[in-house]
Amino acid sequence: MTQGKKKKRAANRSIMLAKKIIIKDGGTPQGIGSPSVYHAVIVIFLEFFAWGLLTAPTLVVLHETFPKHTFLMNGLIQGVKGLLSFLSAPLIGALSDVWGRKSFLLLTVFFTCAPIPLMKISPWWYFAVISVSGVFAVTFSVVFAYVADITQEHERSMAYGLVSATFAASLVTSPAIGAYLGRVYGDSLVVVLATAIALLDICFILVAVPESLPEKMRPASWGAPISWEQADPFASLKKVGQDSIVLLICITVFLSYLPEAGQYSSFFLYLRQIMKFSPESVAAFIAVLGILSIIAQTIVLSLLMRSIGNKNTILLGLGFQILQLAWYGFGSEPWMMWAAGAVAAMSSITFPAVSALVSRTADADQQGVVQGMITGIRGLCNGLGPALYGFIFYIFHVELKELPITGTDLGTNTSPQHHFEQNSIIPGPPFLFGACSVLLALLVALFIPEHTNLSLRSSSWRKHCGSHSHPHSTQAPGEAKEPLLQDTNV
């Protein structure tokens, strides 16, 4: 045992020496310029722009592959993906705290975009790989940790809003472009273009994105072990449960994002099937909603955070979400969908405000763990939400019986015949369920305190997060973080 320990110490000293030499010599190129929010923004934009191009083609392939149970199978596929994301997010977040953000940005983007070229090669493999890619579908987790590394606490809500707005911006034009190119040139060209954009995103990370995690925040050795407790999402949630305020935030995220995830997965089908929207109308709807979301998550979010504070901004966003879901649930006319879309854009301020609040619960070297935990909850919702919505559509006999397709032409609007009549009391039953879920989230969020006891919050969180901290992690003097969940104005 003694000889083994000596060998281990010698190996650690060798690693430390190699690391010092690399640092002294400047190491390998780490990207273009200093780490900035704009690096994260470009990564997010390219990834989701590539997937946005496939909005219309995916509907066609989904219906052709599962003609009898389109809504239900869509929910199950997204459910498996979301469950795997939930299981893997804490581990990837913790590993990024140790090994840096750049390598995991590369990993998550690569595997998230891996299914794209398979759409035309083999639809069955396409949907299978989509399900399995959930293991690495945690780009937002790493991106938010990247942003937290390079911003001060008072800057984070604006930075998170910019990232979320970029996600919305990627959906402003990409579905319309994808639908147009598919109609004129065929869906194969759309798949090739989406694949090229995904490759561009990967190359951008390799060449241009610098590492954001400061060297002093990493463990002293490269071979730092990751405990199974860090890799276990349920253990992470149990530890969070020891802190009542963090638990309230997690419950709020779960109850509010569960219907949102279901809405994302089925809303395009709903507009086409029930509201009789044409492909052009759907693309225009997505574009308008995206533009309004960008305005809400940048200008409006900044003003609200400055004027009413972090918690009240979350409550307001939840209120808008309840209104838009109820409107979609009872709405039976196209103009109601457009009006509810404007309200839905305002509700998009909720998650960046929650992310800003959550970021205050962790030290600089714990941002990946905390954001990974929240992304894990969202990943679980990404599994449960689509499956739940698909099941509710199924039991209410809402199914995609006919899709207006002429070859690869998605522009012809042929009204599908369906036995779900427009005179139903509740045209959109899953959305009404979602409104009830968000109402519960709002009631839970009311118990999140405006201000917290500084000394108690700090010591309590350090005690609970102690097992996540690596023994070699250091923090420079004078870098003490502000207490947890202190509701300061931006």
Swiss-Prot record:
Q: How does it sit in the membrane?
A: Multi-pass membrane protein
Q: Cite a single Pfam family from the UniProt record.
A: MFS_1
InterPro entries in the record = MFS, MFS_dom, MFS_trans_sf, Sugar_transporter_CS, Tet-R_TetA/multi-R_MdtG-like
Q: Name one GO biological process term.
A: spermatid nucleus differentiation
Write down the SUPFAM superfamilies for this protein, in alphabetical order: MFS general substrate transporter
Which GO terms of the cellular component aspect does the record hold? Answer: membrane
Superkingdom of this protein's organism: Eukaryota
Query: Predominant location of this chain?
Result: membrane
* Keyword annotations: Acetylation, Glycoprotein, Membrane, Transmembrane, Transmembrane helix, Transport
Q: State its location(s).
A: Membrane
Q: Which residues are glycosylated?
A: N12, N453
- Where in this protein does the record put region Disordered? 466-490
Parts of the chain on the Extracellular side: 1-40, 96-103, 148-160, 210-243, 306-313, 359-379, 449-490
Protein name listed in UniProt: Hippocampus abundant transcript 1 protein
On tissue specificity, the annotation reads: Expressed in various tissues.
Ranges in the topological domain labelled Cytoplasmic: 62-74, 125-126, 182-188, 265-284, 335-337, 401-427
Q: Please verify whether the record's keywords include Transmembrane helix.
A: yes
Record-annotated membrane-spanning stretches: 41-61, 75-95, 104-124, 127-147, 161-181, 189-209, 244-264, 285-305, 314-334, 338-358, 380-400, 428-448
Recorded hits in PROSITE patterns, A to Z, give:
MFS, SUGAR_TRANSPORT_1
Keyword Translocase present in the record's keywords: the answer is no
A GO term, aspect molecular function: transmembrane transporter activity
The record lists the organism as Mus musculus (Mouse)
Q: Which family does it belong to?
A: Belongs to the major facilitator superfamily.
